[in-house]
A protein has these predicted regions:
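Canonical Radical SAM [4Fe-4S] cluster-binding loop centered on the CxxxCxxC motif
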Residues: 134-186
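Generic beta-strand structural signal
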Residues: 115, 127, 140-144, 152, ...
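Alpha-helix N-cap/helix-start and coil->helix boundary motif
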Residues: 47, 151, 243-245, 266-267, ...
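Conserved AdoMet/S-adenosylmethionine-binding subsite of the radical SAM
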Residues: 182-368
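Auxiliary Fe-S-binding modules of radical SAM enzymes
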Residues: 1-127, 131-133, 188-189, 290-298, ...
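Short linear Ser/Thr-Pro motifs
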Residues: 109-110, 145-146, 239, 261
């Protein structure tokens, strides 16, 4: 797909960079999925891994399908309620395995009904997840974190002030969505066109998903499995600040919707706002967007653009944005800056945002202005942060 369009020399360089990224990622691996008592966490295992774990205790392959159904379609956490499995096997499973969830250490609900979860994992580390309900329809998006902390240090983002602690494992990523569904009682998984209250996943929480690609991909493959949660890839959006070498792979292997945190149209400014730009500048990022295989008129790439007063909000910026994305099936989400303690930026004025949006729309691109949600509980875009710290950090 996208990779096949690249010249060999570029492909070799990109592949080498992918290897480097994955090797660096391994330094921040999540803790083992086996508990101190020897039991194995089943959430987060692929179908093949689940079958292998059951085979190791003497069970046949069809048992994996049964357990998968109970975990991901029915949403159970107790083997004793798996009515299609005989009691002796239920007890055997309970002796060897566990079906866990992250602990909801704190749950806050905004005046606009946005709900923020502070999830605590087995090693005590924490990440935040946000459910954003649609106020017109019975549906909503779950904003999921991929890392504890973040390594990117984007200047306008609260998460960027928190050092990267570690990656989240597939179980912890899937677990956020499952625990949110527990909170709203959305089990068993709706089928077909049946409306879903938690209808979409946006990988826009804490962390850079493409710096934890293996775990994110594994989690999303589980979520998309038709015999479990069965969420369509069209209902999943992966947001990246521009880890260019991993974008081709994500497009080829997952094919989910892509959102790009752009925020500036000149390299000198983006170098400051999104330091990752120094490694993968705007021209490389836009080229990767053009290669992204899911991009079509029906599945547009979303460019996220935070509106910062006097920084990136001029008509010249808007015209340059239009020039950059010309020919890409795209929409531009304009995000009024959401303040957080210690931030140095202000949001652009309403008229300034409207003027910017009109320039983009006049060029033929949808340019909605995102309505801030959950600001009063620091759950809006760019406001997520926990107190988790890397080992050795000051307390």
């Amino acid at each position: 797909m996208g990779v096949a369009l690249m010249q060999p020399a570029i492909l070799d360089l990109t592949e080498a960079e992918r290897v480097r990224i994955l090797a660096k990622t391994a330094r921040f691996n999540p803790p083992p999925a086996r508990l101190a008592d020897g039991r194995r966490e089943l959430i987060g295992l692929s179908r093949a891994e689940l079958a292998a774990e059951l085979a190791a205790i003497g069970e046949k392959p069809f048992r994996a399908k049964q357990v998968w159904h109970w975990m991901y379609h029915q949403g159970v956490t107790d083997f004793s309620v798996m009515s299609s499995i005989a009691r002796p096997l239920q007890e055997k499973l309970a002796e060897n395995f566990v079906i866990g969830r992250p602990e909801a250490a704190v749950v806050q609900t905004s005046t606009d009904e946005t709900r923020k979860f502070l999830f605590r994992f087995r090693d005590g580390q924490e990440a935040e997840t946000v459910y954003i309900p649609d106020r017109q329809e019975d549906r909503g998006a779950v904003c999921i974190s991929s890392q504890v902390g973040c390594t990117l240090s984007c200047r306008f983002c609260h998460t960027g002030t928190q050092t990267l602690v570690r990656n989240l494992g597939a179980a912890e990523i899937v677990g956020q969505f499952m625990a949110a569904r527990d909170s709203y009682g959305e089990w068993p998984s709706p089928r077909g066109e049946t409306p879903r209250l938690l209808s979409t996943i946006v990988l826009m929480g804490m962390g850079e998903p493409l710096y934890n690609y293996e775990n994110v991909a594994k989690a999303m493959i589980i979520v998309m499995d038709n015999e479990g949660i069965a969420l369509s890839r069209r209902r999943i959006t992966l947001s990246t600040s521009g880890v260019v070498p991993m974008m081709d792979r994500a497009g080829a292997e997952l094919g989910v919707n892509l959102a790009v945190s752009l925020h500036a149209v000149r390299d000198d400014l983006r170098d400051e706002l999104v330091p990752l730009n120094r490694k993968y500048p705007i021209a490389e990022l836009i080229a990767a967007c053009r290669r992204y295989p899911a991009a079509s008129n029906a599945r547009r790439i979303t460019f996220e653009y935070v509106m910062l007063k006097g920084v990136n909000d001029t008509p010249a910026d808007a015209h340059e944005l239009v020039r950059l994305i010309a020919g890409i099936p795209a929409k531009v989400n304009l995000i009024p800056f959401n303040p957080w303690p210690g931030s140095v930026y202000e949001t652009s004025s309403g008229p300034t945002i409207d003027r910017f949006a009109n320039i983009v729309m006049d060029a033929g691109f949808s340019s909605p202005v995102r309505s801030p949600r959950g600001r009063d509980i620091l759950a809006a875009c760019g406001q997520l942060r926990t107190e988790s710290q890397a080992k050795g950090s000051a307390s």
